[in-house]
Structures are given as C-alpha cells and as structure tokens.
Amino acid sequence: EDWWPKMVALKVLKQHYMATGDERVIKLMTSYFRYQLANLPEKPLGHWTFWGEWRGGDNLDLVYWLYNITGEDFLLELGDLIHSQTTAWTPMFHGDTKELQTQNSIHCVNLAHGFKEPVIWWQRSHDEKDLNAPKVAWETMKHTIGLPTGLWAGDELLRFGDPTRGSELCTAVEMMYSLEEMIQASGDMQWADHLERVAYNALPTQATDSYDGRQYYQQTNQIACSREWRPFVTPHTDTDNVFGILNGYPCCTCNMHQGWPKFVQNLWYASKDHGAAAFVYAPSTAHITVADGVEAVLRQETGYPFEETVMVTVDFAHKKVRKASF
C-alpha cells in the first residue's frame, strides 16, 4: 500500500500515453488521483515508508501533467496536499535547515528526486523563492559535495570532503529526469546545460554499451573497477564498483534504462511563439506540428559534445510553406 511504488507506475503510464495516446491512461490516472485525494489526509505520503515523502515531487509532477490535459480542479487541490506532505525542499535548499551541510544527511537518490520539486511547485505558487531554490542549492553543493559530472558525492548518503567518494547510477538517471521536468516547467537554459553535463559525462561510463551490466557507484577519475574495500557508506560486500546486474543493490538495474529514452524525448520543446526549441543537442529527428497546423520535420546532425557545430535541417510536409525563422 506504499505510495512510492505507485508513483513509479504512474511514470510508466505517462510514457505509455505519450507513445500511444491510449485514453485509458487518462481515465485510470484520474480515478487514482481521486483515490489519493480521499486517502492522503489519513495516510500521508510517509505513512508506510519515508520514500514517498522524500520523492513526492514525482507525484506532484504527474498530477500537474494530468491537469494540463483535463483541467479538473480537484487535481490542484491534490497537488496542494501532496506538496504539504512532501519533504520541504525549498527551505532546505535556501539553507533554512542544514541537511545540505551535514554529513550522511540525505540519501543521494532522494536528493535527485527532490531537486525538481520546488520548480514543479512554482507553477502553482508563483513564488520566485521556489523557482530559484535549486540554483541556490547547486551553488552550495558545487563547493561541498559537487562533482564535475553535475552530480554529487553520495554512496548512498551525502559525503563531504573527498572527491573520490562514489556516485550512484540511480542518482544520474533521476537527476536527468528532474532536470528534464524543470526545463519543461521553467524554460531555464541553466538546467539544459546541466542536463547535458550529466548525460554526456556520468551516464555513458556507468553502464556497458550493451546495457547488460552497470556499476552501482562511479568514482570520478577512478583507476580500477575492482572488488575491494572502498570507504563507501554502504559497501555491499565490496561489489559497488564492478560491473554486473546484482552488484551493489539491484535498484540501478531496474532504473538505468530510463536515462537515454527520456533524454531523447527532451531534445525538442514547444516554444511560446508556437514554434520549436532545441534546448539540448544530440543527433535526432522530430516530426512536429507548429504555428497554424504546419507540419515539419526537424533534424539535428552533430557530433556534439565532441564537436562544436550542429546542423539543423527543416523539411515541410506541404510545399507551399517556404519560410522558417531561427
């Protein structure tokens, strides 16, 4: 009955709807969110385990996603309730509480989940303090636990004072997801740059090319992937650093596959002027409808980030359309 696994299932349903347009997803999620609104007052997000309240931003994000489709007012009421039961990320990020300055204070993946919550909530609160909270947090983290990959030292709890500490694979893919949702909500290019940093530095090296194995923890500038003792908070019989399926803890095997597909889904965005915007660069093709129903195919050809040029090709389905502005 834990709320947290249901949040994962809702993310899967969202992906299914985006790929197929299956209206059963909308009906199911609407019914589930009515159930949640009725039951959360007595059994809040943290009733069964702490995961739900730390990761409530995922729940909130999905509620607002459905609201943007159906416009049903009860979803806003539910969003207010979920936010009130979720870990208070905005005060934490602004330094009102000391978790970001305290050794072993936060589970590394919970921080990746929670990083987006203030920006998701900002869509409702319109409070600049919420919008800016992750920026304040990252400025703090860069000088304490931050790594060049755009992530942080956490194996599995936050670690200060040593850049060779581990960083969990789940942190990478969940931080990418958070950044992608933050870009959609805010349009802030800082988070697009941050997404590229994680996607092109942390993710490629932490799984095999065939995706039949992964590390649990990655270390910056590590010189060996070996089964031996390292000063991790949770060493898991010293298997965290090698490549495999069940080494470390199995969660990363379940989670690693969302990294690249969701990254590809977030290469192109709709813009306010009814056009399209490429916030993140990668070889890609997008079939889009813009302006007054104009159909177009956009292609990015690039070797970025190893090359500094991106060639964008625009093809229109109707030959009468001859103009495009950049």
Language-model regions: role of each:
Residues 1-326:
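Glycan-recognition and catalytic cores of secretory/periplasmic carbohydrate-active enzymes
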